[in-house]
Design a protein with these regions (language model features):
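Core structural elements
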Residues: 98-110, 161-184, 341-347, 362-375
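Conserved ATP-driven helicase/translocase motor core recognized via long
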Residues: 53, 172-365
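Conserved small/polar residues in nucleotide/adenosyl-binding loops
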Residues: 411-412
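P-loop NTPase Walker
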Residues: 1-119, 355, 359-365, 370-373, ...
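Conserved, charged catalytic cores of large soluble enzymes
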Residues: 393
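ATP-hydrolysis module of ASCE/P-loop NTPase motor domains
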Residues: 31, 92-99, 117-187, 332
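Residues immediately C-terminal
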Residues: 56, 406-407
Length: 412
């Protein structure tokens, strides 16, 4: 039975010579569409591609195995329909060596084939979870003993702020969590250093240029748009037959309030926006009655307005709870202990890596970073492909990823 693809699915299957990102809900057929795209590439009458010229990566080994089975079955079916097709016969042979693997598996393949580029002992092995846990504990113990012995001002500040009177488990947990976050980034050392940039702001002008301020204004814009939709819908209901027209004055007042917020937000005036939100008094909904007004429509407007008010409340309390000046003071107060945390985490990363090299073991994060080191040369902010990357770009016609984790930036 032939599968009927939607127009969106057809685009994913047939689009060529461009990058494609597919976002869809679980169970919506993403993998089936990817398999069909692979088959369409293999069986393209004008530009047929050999299966081993496609790099296909999935999230789990089970998914990789299932995908290989699906592709094999589809090729077998096509070969059944065209038994004399030499290209299809060739694909049945090539699929056994095709790169249909996990992302970690592909990283391991890169390291095995290019280990000489990073001076890695080819006899390495992947460490077990229990072994890694013990190594981390040993490294952390030595690291903290050294830190207490040196009594660096930043470290002592960190301990005074976050350690309890009985133990320093909080410090250990914070270091390990920050380490895991750093290792999910393509360049952990740079990321750790960048974490401190905002805490080193000396002026409001510097604070306003921080990346997170841009994210804040993006969030503000999103909130404004949500409120505008609610207000517009409320006014439509007020003007509808049997609508609560007596509520129109209050909703028009909200519309003007929203316009004022948008104007201040467009000027990127943080304190101004905070003041507008803090000082605003809502116009009350009219208490007058009219028996011709639909009660259900009245309730709809009330609910929409309550939702709108909640947007402004969240914006005020979650995003603009302090003035910019107070925020700068708080950042300065946090600077020393957090610098201690970042420096301790960087030392832990260095010591943990050294311990793993000493035992000639790797973990999965190591594999991602070593593969990246093999493929990319970084000079300042400029990334250049290495010779290995150029070789691989010639080897593969297309790279397809079935699923990935957005928080693993080293993979993305």
């Amino acid at each position: 039975m032939a599968v009927t693809w939607t127009e969106e699915q057809k685009k994913v299957i047939t689009l060529r010579d461009r990058n494609i990102l597919v976002s869809a809900a679980a169970g919506s057929g993403k993998t089936a569409v990817l398999v069909q795209r692979i088959l369409s590439k293999i069986m393209d009458p004008d530009r047929p591609v050999d299966i081993d010229r496609l790099l296909i990566m999935t999230f789990t080994r089970a998914a990789a195995g299932e995908m290989k089975e699906r592709i094999s079955a589809a090729i077998e079916q096509a070969l059944y329909d065209e038994p004399d097709n030499e290209h299809l016969q060739r694909q049945m042979t090539l699929i056994h060596n095709a790169q249909i693997t996990t992302i970690d598996g592909f990283c391991a393949w890169i390291i095995r084939n290019y280990f000489h580029m990073i001076s890695l002992d080819p006899g390495y092995r992947i460490a077990e979870e229990g072994e890694l846990k013990l190594l981390k504990e040993d490294v952390m113990k030595d690291l903290l003993e050294e830190a207490y012995s040196e009594a660096d001002e930043k470290f002592i500040s960190l301990v005074e702020c976050y350690a309890t009177g009985k133990n320093d488990d909080n410090i250990r947990d914070m270091v390990l969590k920050l380490y895991d976050s750093a290792m999910s980034q393509p360049f952990p050392e740079e990321w750790l250093e960048k974490c401190m940039e905002v805490y080193r702001c000396e002026t409001l002008e510097e604070l306003e240029k921080e990346e997170w301020m841009t994210l804040l204004w993006d969030a503000v814009e999103e909130k404004i748009q949500q409120a505008e939709i609610l207000i517009h819908r409320s006014l439509e209901i007020c003007d509808s037959p049997e609508g609560p027209y007596l509520y129109r004055d209050a909703m028009e007042s909200d519309a003007l309030f929203c316009q004022g917020i948008r104007k201040v937000a467009e000027e990127r005036d943080y304190n101004g926006l905070k003041a507008v939100l803090d000082e605003h008094n809502y116009t009350k909904l009219s208490l007058k009655r009219d028996k011709n007004i639909d009660a259900a429509k009245k309730d709809m407007v009330k609910d929409l307005r309550a939702e709108e008010k909640e947007i402004w409340r969240e914006l005020s309390e979650k995003y603009l709870s302090q003035t910019a000046e107070d925020m700068l003071v708080l950042l300065h107060c946090c600077r020393k202990p957090l610098e201690g945390l970042v420096e301790l985490t960087a030392k832990f990363a260095e010591a943990f890596t050294a311990k793993k090299r000493e035992k000639n073991v790797l973990d999965f994060m190591d594999m991602e970073h070593l593969a990246l080191e093999i493929l990319v040369q970084k000079e300042g902010d400029i990334l250049e492909p290495t010779q290995a990357a150029r070789e691989l770009s010639q080897r593969y016609e297309e790279v397809m990823v079935d699923e990935y984790q957005e928080d693993r930036k080293s993979v993305v």
